[in-house]
Amino acid sequence: NERDENYQGSNTQIDSERTSGNYHIFYPQGKYIDMINKRLATLTLKRKIRSDAILMNSFVIGSDGEFFKGMRAWEQRAFFEDCARFFMDKYGYENMLSAVVHVDETTPHMHLNFVPINDGRLSSKSLFDRQKLAELQTELWEQVGKKYGLKRGKENSQATHITAAEHKAKVIVQSAEQKRDEIDRQTEQK
């Protein structure tokens, strides 16, 4: 998720005038595939890596807009640095590929990319099943979130993921409904 002022993507939430404010907690040291291969070469693997193996995990770390509202830039940076440090401590600095903070979208957030090494082997599956992801969220909240006054999200929530397109459509519908209601109120007042 690297981009500069000349980035031409399809995400309409990006404000290109704010893209120059994006920053790295740590930069990628080359192309991701080269960095991954270099890291894997340091391992003593017992088996060949499967062709369908997950070579990189990516997390998006952030909170809702209300959390960042009124927060100074240095406070936001401290929050994201603390989050990155948490992941480095948990999964190993040597496995980290990059951490970039985007401030050019609706809500600031960090993209963190790393090689999923567990017990000296490439294994995203053993690191990130449903239970371990829930535990990860709790640990992150306990070690970082509490410090910033965040509340732990609902555990075992039955909420389902919707696509970005579905979310955008929902926001457009809600906005149109609000405008309609406002017009109705103004019409009733006349």
Where are these regions (language model features)?
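N-terminal nicking endonuclease/strand-transfer module with a His-rich metal-binding environment
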Residues: 1-190
